[in-house]
């Protein structure tokens, strides 16, 4: 069952459903726009590989998601069932599942910059993600959009 979502609930209605649907290997194409850049580097587009896995939880009030970029471990996000979010990388914020099944994350990074991220599934193997980042003074710093396609493995019969 490797590479396939565990849940059959679509669109997801809970954080458990959303995280379960997210597990696996994803191919990501990201377009990023930096608002502070005055030269030709204001826009970039890059392809990457993301691996998402459910991690063990210390208690029944949290759900953990381990995120790896390529072959490198990136971070673990801890989703508290009361809507709080934190990571070992000093990210502290909140999460919310919307009625359309999308997940909204709002958090501050280690530098105090605010980021708002929305992730939603078009199909079980196609995720979209938009992120808007603000400077500490509230001005727009950057925006990005990702389309992510799940890598699936053909099973031999």
From Swiss-Prot:
<dbReference type="InterPro" id="IPR018536">
    <property type="entry name" value="CpcS/CpeS"/>
</dbReference>
<keyword id="KW-0994">Organellar chromatophore</keyword>
<dbReference type="GO" id="GO:0016829">
    <property type="term" value="F:lyase activity"/>
</dbReference>
<dbReference type="Pfam" id="PF09367">
    <property type="entry name" value="CpeS"/>
</dbReference>
<comment type="similarity">
    <text>Belongs to the CpcS/CpeS biliprotein lyase family.</text>
</comment>
<dbReference type="InterPro" id="IPR012674">
    <property type="entry name" value="Calycin"/>
</dbReference>
<keyword id="KW-0456">Lyase</keyword>
<dbReference type="GO" id="GO:0009536">
    <property type="term" value="C:plastid"/>
</dbReference>
<keyword id="KW-0934">Plastid</keyword>
<dbReference type="GO" id="GO:0070111">
    <property type="term" value="C:organellar chromatophore"/>
</dbReference>
<protein>
    <recommendedName>
        <fullName>Chromophore lyase CpcS/CpeS 1</fullName>
        <ecNumber>4.-.-.-</ecNumber>
    </recommendedName>
</protein>
<comment type="function">
    <text>Covalently attaches a chromophore to Cys residue(s) of phycobiliproteins.</text>
</comment>
């Amino acid at each position: 069952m490797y590479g396939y979502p565990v849940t059959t609930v679509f669109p997801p209605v809970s954080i458990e459903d959303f995280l379960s649907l997210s597990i696996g290997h994803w191919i990501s194409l990201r377009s990023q726009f930096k608002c502070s850049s005055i030269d030709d580097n204001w826009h970039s587009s890059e392809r990457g590989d993301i691996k998402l896995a459910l991690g063990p939880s210390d208690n029944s009030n949290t759900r953990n998601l381990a995120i790896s970029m390529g072959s490198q471990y990136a971070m673990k996000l801890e989703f508290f069932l009361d809507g709080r979010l934190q990571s070992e990388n000093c990210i502290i914020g909140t999460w919310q599942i919307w009625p359309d099944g999308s997940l909204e994350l709002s958090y501050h990074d280690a530098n105090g910059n605010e980021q708002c991220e929305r992730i939603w599934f078009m199909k079980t193997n196609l995720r979209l993600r938009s992120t808007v980042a603000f400077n500490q003074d509230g001005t727009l710093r950057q925006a990005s959009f990702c389309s992510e396609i799940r890598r699936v493995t053909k099973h031999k019969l």
